């Protein structure tokens, strides 16, 4: 029984000792209280094992960190060294000897200073064969020295940055339609060594319009027109106004040098006369047989108010009478200004060339408009003022006219504008402005086509007459354009006669150079 009690007590002691050990090592009991229970050698063994494990862990961590640092440095050197090497080595240094590349940069600076001093001083008589860099460095040959100087001068220059001028984006929509455009990159913008005065004169002359050049062109154009028009004799007539009876008295005197229309070498001429724009009332002379120089001496009277004479024209048509066929037209004479010779208070005799024609020219009326161009803004203003004596297009003897203006470039219509429609009138008044944006460098490439249209509610609108203005126009159209360019910023107003469009149809949109443009071809 005693042995069993001892075994139970010992087991209880072991369990208590085990619990105390767990509490001590778990940190729930202070170590000083536990140190008296355990032997000293055992506690020392536990502390030494802990110190060894901590030191071993520190060694492992240090070694891993050092290895990671070495690996990162190696990778960084492999990646960045080629870039640094390419930057450090100049592209032209390889052509120089190896001895120059090993020289210090301070020598380069001293050589540059010496070169500046030598340029300021007179040139020496002889070139030194070599220059000592230091007491320990070898001699540099003279050829290497000159190459070094050239290299330094080349890299010491400050390169100037140049930019090409860019055009304004305002007229991009206009330039897309133009077949010809100025290549800005081909213009030479280099700085020359010209004198300042001469360069200033060149700048001021660019873009300036010289009126005398345009005047010379207009004079030449008038001479060319006279040469182009074929004449077929002369017509002599006299004009006088009867103030009491309000009559215009026209006396057809004679004609000279008419062409032969018959097989016999003669003609049977007679003359028709109109006071335009009224074609309902006409007069005709007697027929003179077999003569090329007929003598008429016949008087005709047109009832007209004196104040209306400035808006009237005399139209003479000379015909060759043929009994069995259609009468052949010899030519015509149109007197636009009845006051060309005098005020008609007394009889005034007039000689006019007979212009060859095969058909009678129909008077379609006139249009008055003004042109004004602002070169700085690149803006052209066409003001349609009014029309007069338009041709009647309706059965009622009237028309419903409106004006259609097209901006043309080499037969293609770039833009179009139109005025309001005036109802039942042959003398409409508009006073409407039409604006086009045209860059100054493209003014000589464009023209304006002005068409007077008759509005028709049913069917197509009909063309009454057209006129053109521009550098490629003829007669008054070109003169009006040149006058606008010579006196820019000032409205220039003129009357223009309306002409029949050759081969016209009932619709203006399908005619000639005023047709709708084709879309530009894509590259």
Curated annotation (Swiss-Prot):
Example GO biological process: chemical synaptic transmission
Residues that, per the record, bind Ca(2+) 4? 394, 400, 454, 456
Segments passing through the bilayer: 56-76
Identify the InterPro entries for this entry: C2_dom, C2_domain_sf, Synaptotagmin
Cofactor(s) the protein needs: Ca(2+)
**How does this chain sit within the bilayer?**
Single-pass membrane protein
Ligand binding (Ca(2+) 3)? 322, 325, 328
Q: Can you say where in the cell this protein is located?
A: Cytoplasmic vesicle, Secretory vesicle membrane
Gene Ontology, cellular component aspect = exocytic vesicle; glutamatergic synapse; plasma membrane; presynapse; synaptic vesicle membrane
Keywords noted in UniProt: Calcium, Cytoplasmic vesicle, Disulfide bond, Exocytosis, Membrane, Metal-binding, Phosphoprotein, Repeat, Transmembrane, Transmembrane helix
CDD domains per record = C2A_Synaptotagmin-1-5-6-9-10, C2B_Synaptotagmin-3-5-6-9-10
The Swiss-Prot or TrEMBL record annotates one GO molecular function as:
phosphatidylserine binding
Q: Which residues lie on this side of the membrane: Vesicular?
A: 1-55
Q: Where is the C2 domain?
A: 231-352, 363-496
Q: Where does Ca(2+) 1 bind?
A: 262, 268, 320-322
What does this chain do? Answer: Ca(2+) sensor specifically required for the Ca(2+)-dependent exocytosis of secretory vesicles containing IGF1 in neurons of the olfactory bulb. Exocytosis of IGF1 is required for sensory perception of smell. Not involved in Ca(2+)-dependent synaptic vesicle exocytosis. Acts through Ca(2+) and phospholipid binding to the C2 domain: Ca(2+) induces binding of the C2-domains to phospholipid membranes and to assembled SNARE-complexes; both actions contribute to triggering exocytosis.
| Subunit structure comment from the entry | Homodimer; disulfide-linked via the cysteine motif. Can also form heterodimers with SYT3, SYT6, SYT7 and SYT9.
What UniProt notes about the protein's domains is: The cysteine motif mediates homo- or heterodimer formation via formation of disulfide bonds. The first C2 domain mediates Ca(2+)-dependent phospholipid binding.
The family note in this entry says: Belongs to the synaptotagmin family.
- Protein name as annotated: Synaptotagmin-10
* Underlying gene: Syt10
